[in-house]
Amino acid sequence: MDILLLGLNYKTAPVEIREKFTFSDDGTARALHLLSQTKSIAECIILGTCNRTEIYVVCDQANIGRDYTRRFLAEWFGVEKEQFKDHLYIKENEQAIEHLFRVSSGLDSMVMGETQILGQVRDAFLLGQEHQTTGTVFNTLFKQAITFAKRAHTETAIGQNAVSVSYAAVELGKKIFGSFAGKSVLIVGAGKMSELTAKHLHANGSERVMVANRTLERAQLLAEKFKGDSCTMEQLPEALLTADIVISSTGATGYVLGKKELAPIMKQRKHRPLFMVDIAVPRDLNPDLHDLDNVFLYDIDDLEGIVASNVAERSREAERLDVMIQEEIVAFTTWYQTLGVAPLIAALRDKANTIQSEAMRKIENKLPNLSEREMHIIRKTTKGIVNQLLHDPVVRLKEMAATKDGEEVLDIFEKMFALEEILERKEQEAIWANDKNKQTSSSREQVLVSRFPD
């Protein structure tokens, strides 16, 4: 069995391509069911976010799984394979496992170290479990990846340093105020960056929001998002009297506030500290504001300097995580390699039991006068001999299967004990049983569709 991943993300595909491969909530469940009906695919999970669409499958053979999954993507979304082949990445086995650990821990995210993706991976896994498209392999792999991601954020600082300008402003504010609880935010201008910064401040405890804008209607629209108030630029001096934090991004061609305008306001405020963030280019706030006591002014360059420093810090943490991920891969692949042991052991015991049963039949034919008690003793003794003979080979097989040469060991063991025919028969029986289950499931779905048409 092979583990396979096919996907598109923000690194490989522009948004106009990614948006063609977006699963709806209902669509994901139906897609999982359809994909799981494919003969070669034993398990499947679909991970869909605004930045990535990924399909994880456990399949009989990697090349067949690749073809089926590629065709599935094309047919499900009605897109020719040629249109997305250059944007599609395909990873197998250890590469696919490593990719999942990187995705879960936020290492592969647009904003390195973000934690939202962990919840999305968990939701994708739970949906697969709910619709019974996961089995032994993915139940183990995804649980391990989710547990690792939680540990990564606990044991490293991968998500602790701001790597966006808007969040860097929040970090600066915390250094000045300690806490934003009860603080009042004044947003000057209704630009996107102002909104993002205000959103972060609001999430960190700031309670009152006022939006000042040249157009009152736009100010009102933004203020509503934070259940705040709005005012015009003419009312800015009055709004500054009660503000603790000012975020400015108006897009004006000149300064909207300087020392001359703010000095008398600071007197009325009794020089209560004022934290000001100018994220406009060109700048909104005159640098001469630095001359005023208790005015803490930061512009876009200050914030980008913090971001650059934090990006470097996250990169160092990412190197630590890479080492941790390699350890996780070894742990999983060691377990995964032992999965091939169970069918071999079962086949070996099957063969040994057949030989023992045949021997007992011959004894009964040649010695028909043996009592039931005597036959019981012989049967028990021969079974004991079989178990003793199998014990050491089975123990050694389990140990050697967990090494880097595990696959070769399993292959040699299979040939040494001539288990090919038994394994082939058991595999065929499993395929028949699986096909029967899929036919039953498909029939039930058709009945439901006929009863409850769209």
UniProtKB/Swiss-Prot annotation:
The catalytic activity, as recorded, is: (S)-4-amino-5-oxopentanoate + tRNA(Glu) + NADP(+) = L-glutamyl-tRNA(Glu) + NADPH + H(+)
Q: What is the E.C. number?
A: 1.2.1.70
Pathway field of the UniProt record reads: Porphyrin-containing compound metabolism; protoporphyrin-IX biosynthesis; 5-aminolevulinate from L-glutamyl-tRNA(Glu): step 1/2
Instruction: Please indicate if the UniProt record lists Zinc as a keyword.
Output: no
**What Pfam families does the database record attribute to this sequence?**
GlutR_dimer (PF00745), GlutR_N (PF05201), Shikimate_DH (PF01488)
Q: Which GO biological process entries does UniProt record here?
A: protoporphyrinogen IX biosynthetic process from glutamate
GO molecular function term, any single one: glutamyl-tRNA reductase activity
Q: Which InterPro entries does the record associate with it?
A: 4pyrrol_synth_GluRdtase, 4pyrrol_synth_GluRdtase_dimer, 4pyrrol_synth_GluRdtase_N, GluRdtase_CS, GluRdtase_dimer_dom_sf, GluRdtase_N_sf, NAD(P)-bd_dom_sf, Shikm_DH/Glu-tRNA_Rdtase
Family membership, please give it. Belongs to the glutamyl-tRNA reductase family.
Q: Additional comments on file?
A: During catalysis, the active site Cys acts as a nucleophile attacking the alpha-carbonyl group of tRNA-bound glutamate with the formation of a thioester intermediate between enzyme and glutamate, and the concomitant release of tRNA(Glu). The thioester intermediate is finally reduced by direct hydride transfer from NADPH, to form the product GSA.
This protein is called: Glutamyl-tRNA reductase
Record organism: Brevibacillus brevis (strain 47 / JCM 6285 / NBRC 100599)
